[in-house]
Amino acid sequence: MNNLNLLQPYRNEPSANVIYGPIQPQLLREEVLADLLEASAQRDPEHVALIFGERHVSYRELDRQADQVASALIEAGVRPGQIVGLWLPRGIELLVMQAGIAKTGAAWLPLDQDTPVERLQICLEDADAVGVVCCETLRPLLAHTGLTVWTAEVLLMQSYTAPVRRSGVSPDHPAYVIYTSGSTGKPKG
């Protein structure tokens, strides 16, 4: 049995490079999603980053708006490694909020706009989320949940001359958390 190794692929065989690709340690860096966004904004600031319908957002604008969101969330106490719920309709604002949450070092927990409030609350409590970002239209539905709620509209209106910077972010922190319906009917993350 000592010579039998069924659990590890044969990386030394030529066919292994076709299946797994060559090992390239120079590509493994300690970057996080926010670092990649910022690098793209510096490299190609006017390049289109997001398109939704007729709306186009450049990397510069995405980075600027994400900085606004991150600054507001950091000032509100959001820290690296924490989880923030994200309950918005699909669109540019949803993606800007994802980038902003990533810039805090926290993870986002996406919840579809049609998610019932009871299910949303179960997921956020189970994930130990520090709060939820939604839009003004959905905010009234969260009034009696006891959750900390931020709205995208308010987060995007905040103005910071010097963005509040994250610290203590590690590639080991989660970037996002997903919940499924679960076979028991209880959401599982």
Per-range role (PLM):
Residues 1-189:
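Carrier-protein-dependent adenylate-forming modules in NRPS/ANL systems
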